[in-house]
Swiss-Prot record:
Taxonomic classification: Eukaryota, Metazoa, Chordata, Craniata, Vertebrata
CDD domains named in the record: cytochrome_b_C, Cytochrome_b_N
Record's miscellaneous remark: Heme 1 (or BL or b562) is low-potential and absorbs at about 562 nm, and heme 2 (or BH or b566) is high-potential and absorbs at about 566 nm.
A Pfam match: Cytochrome_B
Residue sites binding a ubiquinone per the record: 201
Species name: Eliurus minor
Protein name (database record): Cytochrome b
A GO biological process held by the record: mitochondrial electron transport, ubiquinol to cytochrome c
Cofactors: heme b
Amino acid sequence: MTNIRKSHPLLKIINHSFIDLPTPSNISSWWNFGSLLGICLILQIATGLFLAMHYTSDTTTAFSSVTHICRDVNYGWLIRYLHANGASMFFICLFIHVGRGMYYGSYMSMETWNMGIILLFAVMATAFMGYVLPWGQMSFWGATVITNLLSAIPYIGTTLVEWIWGGFSVDKATLTRFFAFHFILPFIIVALVMVHLLFLHETGSNNPSGLNSDADKIPFHPYYTIKDILGILLLFLFLISLVLFSPDLLGDPDNYTPANPLNTPPHIKPEWYFLFAYAILRSIPNKLGGVLALILSILVLALLPHLHTSKLQSLMFRPLTQTLYWILVADLLTLTWIGGQPVEYPFVIIGQLASVLYFAIILIFMPMAGMIEDNMLKMD
């Protein structure tokens, strides 16, 4: 008799996706982050659901309701900090996942890659709206500054901003709709993840060598399930340590002050995971130019398959492009640091140089290095 997991219509899908899935035998721990992202998403939806049971999306009570969750709800403080720091874990895994895709040339599977970029935008939008909900000073002013960027769009900008606000400033209507969107988007993300996996399983996983691995495949379970469980345990160890020892390490002290439209904080800045994009935005003096650079800083990833000049897919055997890749990583860390600094000398010029370098490496230097390496290997 056929095993039920191979015959049952529902179990068959799970079987083909997580059990009998043919997987390259040589994928490294960098391939663990996809499953870690799945775990992060489940954790965020679970903790978010419990927070939503006690949260009120009204400007007069939002801040108090978050305080009430931390003080009066059983383990409310734990749920709240798991959710806040879980978002940071989510983005750490996301950045590593995208970075691995760039390093090993996974972007050559274009459908999967483009779906990933859409997912990245969706997660960033969700995280931004989530940051507004506690209605602290940084929540309010962050929402004001970032939504106000849309006013840079010619002709329809101001109307668009007021339409998003639901009035003439960030107020009750804005908070209510942000809560509604923050609640629904993760479920849309789950659907997008399924499409992402559908595209991935059409082509199969890439591997560190960048070569075709059809001749050397092993079943996903038990080899990679056990490997993923180790990754999940390490992720939880890191997350629980952060939540229990220093839950506010990655937050902003200003967000413990209730939102006040009459008092602007000295430095308005988003959460740490948006700082690199914020630094690119600030490095351009023109408002519209800054907004375009901000969007392009993520959208440039969609160009990677078209900018791939080498005959080798992975960077494993390409020392020149490898060097550029790690310079790019250092550059992104520099941008993250600059995004959290005040707008003054020398931070402005460092931010501008780092922004130019970011786009130059991706659009110019990496494609050039690919051609040089091909030439050195005489692969023509």
